[in-house]
Amino acid sequence: MYRQQSFITLDQFYEWRPLSRLEALLSFIDFTLLEQFFRYDPHKRGPKGYSWKCLLLALIAMQVEQIATVKALVQRLRSDPVFKRCLGFGYLDRTPSESTLNRFVSLLAGTDVLEKTFRRMVCRARKLGLVDGANVAIDSSKLTAYEHAVPKSRIPENNPAFPNWGGKLDTNGNFIKWFGWKMHALVDTYSGMPISYVITPANVADMDIAEPLIQKMMDDYDREIHPKYYMMDAGYDKPELYANIYTKFHGQAIIPINWRNTKLPPEGINMEGQLVCTMNYPYVYGGNDNGTIRLLCPHACGKCDCPMGSAWCSPSNTGYVGKVKIKDDPRFITSPFRGTPAFEKLYNQRTSVERTFGDLKDNYNLDNIRVAKMARVKVFMDLSCIALLASRLSDAVGKDKSKAA
């Protein structure tokens, strides 16, 4: 039996085959800032080493292909020549070692070039109409540390870069506890793409990070993104946060009321956080005039059957009409009103941030942290977000080409 000789080379096969999802995704990575940071020095002597671009593509492919460890990534590069060629390496080139990739991760951990690259890609998505920025959702997600868990008594008090213990309620109401970090993300509800994010130890409260995260978004994009509504869960219910979002960022916080240990609401407010009349019926929203809300009598509007009638509050045939300003108390005076379908419709958009976290963890390896120290964890967080954004850009451009065809 004679072995038939192939009529095409491996390079020809690679050029003729259809473009894979990984290659399409990697083609949308913006290397502009990375090329400036890893500038080639022709006068440098010694071994040339590996291409920084190939090393970076290998780390991004590790997140996309959900490869568990750097060691497994090296084994994949050695055993899969097509995968190796997709990342820019030649078939006969030496494969980078595990130590080489770990040193490259440490190099990236000392810079913010990956986060700046992510922001450039967000700006590109905005130009393509993928990111709206009018409504955003904020939430946090747990990341378990790779370090061994230690008791609280052994955690340094003055080290904000050390992992800590955190706890929260899951979707079923069960309390979960973990040792590690939190990823706080601000997500565009229109596209489900993250716009800004930070990492903190797990013991940091969500409400304390919301305002710095919004300020970071404003600074990163030179205030080109102006969200009108900020959707958050009840854990962010903090009076100062409402006021700062309204006065500093000119937006409206959409957050359910969390009374915590309060037994009775303030006067003129019911337990749902709605403004009520003297008979404890919620006022009807009458419109917003440049921050001034008109309050209409619920009996006159047919929303309730008040035993006192509309004459109890006003002799007018149209009933009582009042005015309040949002700036006086943005927590309770909102536009739209709490309890209205418009308010609920806005708040339902908050689930977009949960879907984004699920996408990052299920499809881009964010739930598989195998490095220690906050700066190195941040590198893999950046890589996952860049991979997610590149995937969305690739899908959007591919759909446009299909429609044009």
Where do the language-model regions lie?
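Short, positively charged, Gly/Tyr-enriched micro-motifs
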Residues: 48-116
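Charged, often Cys/His-bearing segments associated with DNA-binding zinc-finger transcription factors
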Residues: 1-36, 314, 396-405
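Short acidic (Asp/Glu) and glycine-rich catalytic loops that position anionic groups and cofactors
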Residues: 36-38, 191, 332-339, 361-367
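Helix-centered, glycine/charged polyanion-binding patches within enzymatic domains
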Residues: 243-358
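A short glycine/serine-rich beta->alpha loop
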Residues: 41-47, 199, 371-373
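Basic, short loop/linker segments at the boundary and entry of helix-turn-helix/winged-helix-like folds
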Residues: 19-61, 65, 102
